[in-house]
Curated annotation (Swiss-Prot):
Keyword terms, alphabetized: Amino-acid biosynthesis, Aminotransferase, Histidine biosynthesis, Pyridoxal phosphate, Transferase
EC number: 2.6.1.9
Protein name in the entry: Histidinol-phosphate aminotransferase
InterPro entries: Aminotrans_II_pyridoxalP_BS (IPR001917), Aminotransferase_I/II_large (IPR004839), HisP_aminotrans (IPR005861), PyrdxlP-dep_Trfase (IPR015424), PyrdxlP-dep_Trfase_major (IPR015421), PyrdxlP-dep_Trfase_small (IPR015422)
Modified residues (N6-(pyridoxal phosphate)lysine): 211
Amino acid sequence: MSIENLARTNVRDLTPYQSARRLGGNGDVWLNANEYPIAPEFQLTAQTFNRYPECQPALVIERYAEYAGVKKEQVLVSRGADEGIELLIRAFCEPGKDAILFCPPTYGMYAVSAETFGVERRTVAAKQDWQLDLPAIADSLDNVKLIYVCSPNNPTGNLIDANDLRSLLEMAKGKAIVAVDEAYIEFCPQASVAGWLNDYPHLAILRTLSKAFALAGLRCGFTLGNEDLIALLLKVIAPYPLSTPVADIAAQALSTEGIRIMRQRVTEIAANRSWLLQALQNCACVEQVFTSDSNYLLARFTASSNVFKTLWDQGIILRDQNKQPGLSGCLRITIGTREECQRVVDALSALPGATKTRQEPM
């Protein structure tokens, strides 16, 4: 008998999330995972590796609460924001009965996490401008316990309209948790909904140190919510989600100096993003570049498969978005160093058709 026959049916049928590392590649310019291109330096200060860590490391919680402008009781730390996505499903959704709802094109882990736990995945496609289709969502809320909204949205890069988010929260009152994924909020901090927590007890906010804090390898994320919501998540989280070294480095990253350095990175990435956006608009193989409030750009190409493979063969690894609804011909490009951005532009400019006659980026 195959061991697979012992597995749960939904797990046998599951297609795992195709992360950048799972997809692989042999490049030296990695622009496919929205990581910061340069590794930060930290020194471990904690040496108590013989002891179990705190369930919720006090210094990490304290510093993140201060940074986010919320109370300590409104913060939960986890192994990346991905664990936060799962914790919400485990805490609020009955398998085989309840559903989650999300609006593609968007981050793929919402669907994978729900499928893993036997929870229905319900989708309402975003409108042509990638904003929420509120009437369609209102018609789809039967048995929905969780609504995931990514803002800025991955992979499109746009912010979700704040008035629409408020309308969604009003619509979901007494029915569902609204989880706003703010993994990229450091690139547009004015758009955070963290200040809304006291108004909406059914609001959860997902955060991470993987992007602007340049700590994707650390696997440290946060869920913000009111005390009752956090208390429920604490019931289902593993007893020691963060190892001692992870908590040590996270606390350093959230120090006054760590936050200053993070904001310096954001300024640098924003400048490179503006440069790359203009440069891509000069490339004949590019049909459209979409504006972004994050650390990546989405672009539609005339022959995206050829572009993807040509750059792949040169060691420049991008993220193919062709399978996402409404994103035919689209590739997502992480904003790297200026030199990495130049490598992308040089490779694209060498493709047949050369470049458009337009002003060069400064």
